[in-house]
A protein has these predicted regions:
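Extracellular glycan-interacting surfaces
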Residues: 1-179
C-alpha cells in the first residue's frame, strides 16, 4: 500500500515532512546534475540574467540569426538583436506573461504568435494559467490577444505550429485538445 493514510484516514505529519524533504533533495540533485552537464558539454551562458522565470521557447529570425525572441513563463517575451549579448522586454503590458510556446511566420518574420499557460509544472499554487494566444505583426513591439482563444479551453497552450504551405493556418495543442 503506497498510501500515507493510516487506518483512520489521516496522514501523519511526519509523513508529509519526509515527502517534502525527499522532493527538495531530488530537486537539488537534479539541479546540480544539470549544471554539471551544461558546463561539461561546452555550453556558454548568454543570458538574460536580470529576470526570473523559465525560458520555454526560443524563436530565431529566419534570415538574421542575431535576432531572437525568448518566451518565459513568468518573465514574458524578450528580444535580442545582437545574438544574445543583451535582451529587451517586449511585452510588459501584455495581459498575460506566462509564455510557454512561440512560433514565427515563415513568410513574414514580423509576425509571431505566443501561446500562454504552463502545464506539467506543479507547485502548491498550481501551474501558471494563460490567456490563450497572442499575435504581433511588428516583431514583438505590440501584442494582441486572439479573441477566439479567450476561453478556458485555451488556458494552457502547450505548442503552436504554423502550416508552412499556408501561414494563415495556426495549429495549437492545448490541455483541452488540438485546434
Amino acid at each position: 500500500n503506497l498510501s500515507l493514510m493510516d487506518e483512520n484516514g489521516f496522514i501523519p505529519a511526519d509523513g508529509l515532512i519526509n515527502a517534502n524533504q525527499q522532493i527538495k533533495a531530488m530537486r537539488a540533485q537534479q539541479e546540480a546534475a544539470s549544471k554539471k552537464a551544461i558546463t561539461s558539454n561546452g555550453w556558454t551562458w548568454l543570458g538574460p540574467g536580470n529576470i526570473g522565470g523559465r525560458v520555454r521557447s526560443v524563436v530565431i529570425h529566419p534570415t538574421n540569426t542575431n535576432i531572437m525572441w525568448a518566451g518565459s513563463v513568468t518573465g514574458g517575451i524578450w528580444k535580442t538583436t545582437n545574438g544574445g549579448a543583451s535582451w529587451a522586454i517586449m511585452d510588459d503590458f501584455m495581459t498575460n506573461m506566462a509564455v510557454s510556446t512561440m512560433v514565427i511566420d515563415p513568410t513574414n518574420p514580423e509576425v509571431l504568435y505566443a501561446g500562454t499557460g504552463e502545464t506539467g509544472y506543479y507547485s502548491d499554487y498550481g501551474p501558471p494559467r494563460g490567456a490563450g494566444v497572442f499575435k504581433t505583426t511588428n516583431g514583438g513591439t505590440t501584442w494582441t490577444q486572439l479573441a477566439s482563444t479567450n476561453t478556458p479551453d485555451w488556458y494552457y497552450v502547450n505548442r503552436l505550429a504554423i502550416n508552412p504551405a499556408n501561414p494563415l493556418i495556426l495549429l495549437a495543442a492545448t490541455d483541452s485538445g488540438t485546434w
